[in-house]
């Protein structure tokens, strides 16, 4: 198997499912991009720049629990290369952000399958996100995915 490791910044929306107090849906997208981190005496500077290429699209279903945890499943399509399906490892968590009007959270997903170049994929994806009161999501993924050789 061949290992690929990459990071993407997704932006999109999350919101409640009509008729359910605990279920939500999320949709977000990430363009092809470069991420830059510079460490220096003046602190940490970061930047994300969109570049030419295709985009990734995430679609997921979330069920939240009273203790601030949640489970999630869904798919991420990586342009025309294919997609992966995922489910939560254990439970994710959400908490109030120190920035008023935002919630922050994190979750780890296991890759349960895929298609196209991702057929037979395995691996883990971490998601570290912030959600505004209006449902706008900024979500940073780090993926370690194993692809079949050939």
Model-identified regions with their sequence ranges:
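Beta-strand-enriched cores of mature, soluble protein domains
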Residues: 1-150
């Amino acid at each position: 198997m061949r290992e690929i490791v990459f990071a993407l910044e997704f932006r999109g929306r999350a919101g409640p499912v009509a008729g359910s107090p605990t279920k939500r849906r999320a949709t977000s997208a990430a363009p092809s991009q470069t991420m830059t981190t510079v460490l220096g005496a003046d602190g940490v500077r970061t930047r994300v720049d969109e570049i030419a290429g295709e985009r990734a699209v995430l679609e997921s279903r979330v069920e939240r629990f009273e203790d601030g945890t949640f489970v999630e499943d869904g798919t991420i399509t990586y342009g025309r290369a294919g997609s992966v399906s995922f489910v939560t490892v254990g439970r994710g968590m959400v908490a109030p952000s120190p920035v008023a009007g935002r919630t922050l959270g994190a979750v780890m997903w296991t890759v349960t399958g895929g298609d196209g170049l991702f057929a037979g994929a395995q691996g883990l994806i971490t998601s570290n996100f912030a959600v505004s009161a209006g449902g706008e999501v900024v979500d940073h993924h780090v993926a370690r995915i194993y692809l079949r050789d050939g």
